[in-house]
């Protein structure tokens, strides 16, 4: 990752020209260099920032985009680019600096907005919208999963969020281990026997690697992490009632590693239900782990979920399970499903 300098905050100028009604090409000048950014008109400002981050390493939350005669519209991450009249003669300006060192202070970690629940019918609608499918296909073409350890044939896949799932990222402590969810290593050790493990966070890869290293997850002798995914793997989807928001499409993993993972052998834990709106059948909404100092002696979520994971691992296909009822699932359910 490029390092920041002591020079004044760099700015980026972008000229745009349409290739088709759907695709835009932005020439971005940043820090003395020019980059070409291709983006579709049905993408959002959030996606534009994500693309710029991929090229410049300026995190989306550090970017300020300016464009003549539209006021502060570009401060709205949910705004669709199709609503802006780009002209080749005008330039967009991005103000932002590269972060060389991540601030470990928990108050500096990314904000998590309140979760909301989509109705069952609308969740299906979001998943099946052609515009959202197109966004997923584009992300599949753009993103590369770097494997830390080889995928294991015959193993199921467990995808885990970080913030409020494995770690209380808002409380403060002298040692990050004090904010780790209880029984994390025992949980991952047990799960690893039946599942490959991937960590997917809505933050930068640098922050993911730092946090997982601090918690002792990446160098644990009892289990291995197959891959880490960051915010660049996410997509922005459109909902009729909730507008535009980011989510984590498991279809990305299934498309890039089809010989190992599929809807029938994958489960994802996240405290935000909307993150698996593109694959609701595979998501389990975990109880958020907040206020670690007050709750770490009583939180048993990972203990109970360990039993659930090991129980359903006996099934050949997980796609028919209702993970919202996981607490009432038992060995008897497995036997009954085998007999069906």
Curated annotation (Swiss-Prot):
Residue numbers binding Mg(2+): 161, 163, 271
InterPro entries: FCP1_dom, HAD-like_sf, HAD-SF_hydro_IIID, HAD_sf, Ubiquitin-like_dom, Ubiquitin-like_domsf, UBLCP1
Primary enzyme class: hydrolase
GO BP of this protein: regulation of proteasome assembly
One GO MF term attached to the UniProt entry: metal ion binding
Gene3D superfamilies tied to this protein: HAD superfamily/HAD-like, Phosphatidylinositol 3-kinase Catalytic Subunit, Chain A, domain 1
Sequence ranges assigned to domain Ubiquitin-like in this UniProt record: 24-101
Residue segments, region Phosphatase: 151-312
EC number: 3.1.3.16
Boundaries of every FCP1 homology domain copy: 151-312
Cellular compartment(s): Nucleus
Domain-related comment: The Ubiquitin-like domain mediates interaction with proteasomes.
Name of this chain's protein: Ubiquitin-like domain-containing CTD phosphatase
Organism lineage: Eukaryota, Viridiplantae, Streptophyta, Embryophyta, Tracheophyta
């Amino acid at each position: 990752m490029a390092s920041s300098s002591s020079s004044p905050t760099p700015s980026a100028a972008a000229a745009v020209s349409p290739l088709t009604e759907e695709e835009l090409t932005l020439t971005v000048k940043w820090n003395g260099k020019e980059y070409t950014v291709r983006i579709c008109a049905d993408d959002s400002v959030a996606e534009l920032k994500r693309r710029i981050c991929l090229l410049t390493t300026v995190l989306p939350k550090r970017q300020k985009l300016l464009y003549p005669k539209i006021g502060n519209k570009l401060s709205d991450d949910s705004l669709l680019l199709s609503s802006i009249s780009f002209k080749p003669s005008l330039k967009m300006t991005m103000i932002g600096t590269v972060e060389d060192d991540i601030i470990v202070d928990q108050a500096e970690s990314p904000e998590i907005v309140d979760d909301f629940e989509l109705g069952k019918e609308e969740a299906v609608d979001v998943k099946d919208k052609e515009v959202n499918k197109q966004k997923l296909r584009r992300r599949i073409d753009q993103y590369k999963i770097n494997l830390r350890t080889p995928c294991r044939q015959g193993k199921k896949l467990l995808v885990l969020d970080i913030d409020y799932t494995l770690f209380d990222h808002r409380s403060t402590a002298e040692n990050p281990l004090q904010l780790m969810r209880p029984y994390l290593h025992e949980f991952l050790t047990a799960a690893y026997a039946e599942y490959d493990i991937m960590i997917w966070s809505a933050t930068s890869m640098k922050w993911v690697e730092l946090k997982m290293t601090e918690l002792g997850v990446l160098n644990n002798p009892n289990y291995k992490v197959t891959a880490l995914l960051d915010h660049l793997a996410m997509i922005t989807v459109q909902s009729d009632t909730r507008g535009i928001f980011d989510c984590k499409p498991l279809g990305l993993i299934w498309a890039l590693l089809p010989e190992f993972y599929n809807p029938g052998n994958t489960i994802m834990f996240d405290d935000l239900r909307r993150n698996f709106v593109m694959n609701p059948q595979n998501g389990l909404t975990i109880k958020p782990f907040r206020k670690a100092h007050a709750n770490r002696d009583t939180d048993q979520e990972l203990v109970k979920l360990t039993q659930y994971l090991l129980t359903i691992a006996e099934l050949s296909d997980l796609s028919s399970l209702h993970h919202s009822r996981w607490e009432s699932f038992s060995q008897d359910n497995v036997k009954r499903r085998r007999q069906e």
